[in-house]
Amino acid sequence: MENNTDTQFVQQAVMNLPALRDLVGAADLKARKSLGQNFLFDLNLTSKIARAAMPFANTVIEIGPGPGGLTRALLLEGAEQVIAVEKDRRVLGFLQHLIDAANGRLTFIEADALAQAVWELGTAPRQIIANLPYNIATTLLLQWLEHADDFASFILMFQKEVAMRITAQPGDAAYGRLSIITQWRATAECVFDIPPEAFIPPPKITSTVVRIIPRPKPLADCKASDLEAVTAIAFGQRRKMLRASFKRYGGAAFIEKAGIDPASRPQDLPIEAFCALARLYSQIEQ
């Protein structure tokens, strides 16, 4: 009962805050292109992103909160512990009003997300919910997937083109290294699109929210480094047959030993086949 009362108190305090656009205008807080910032003010959309993550984990980590639109939504939807990682010092000062309203449920860390071990923040289970800077979004995802066991889920916004690559299936035009490495470690699905005009300033592309849920264990047995290596070889020239791409390792004989047709092309193979190649590659490279 006490927890519900505290949630209601925080929700009311956040609802009583001035409109976000008004606060941003008064503070003359402008998005910085150098930081990949695009502010999202629409509470309907930020709430939709927050609800896509429910039920919330013990620790909700937000990367790059900006003026706090999504942060507000997380608190309004009942998140009990939000840790926001932000490198823009202007924003940290601007968000003091939200820290006060959150009544202990919100903590800010001034740090570069690329250098921050977010998998060590708060208490497990953790989840990351973020409108990511597009210029580092893929790098961050791959870094976090190396620590997938430390997370319950990721609800992340990407350029639509990147979202399609993350969620693509064998045979899809977008299927490639990012699809394989992500889905080897997690399930991934596109949840909904957000149009450019929802942001300030509007980007030139449509954005897509993706839900990524780490698997209890990887889809098939192999080392991550070996999987990265064989997918780099296979997709280096994606139109080539695998026997040509792996000529250095024995060509057709190498591919057949993994139980794969040497005439196959990489975009048609399931993840398990790449894992079989990775295991063979590991034996050769030892």
Annotate each language-model stretch with its function.
Residues 1-233, 276-282, 286:
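Catalytic cores of RNA-modifying enzymes
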Residues 214, 231-286:
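C-terminal lobe and adjacent flexible extensions of AdoMet/dcAdoMet transferase-like proteins
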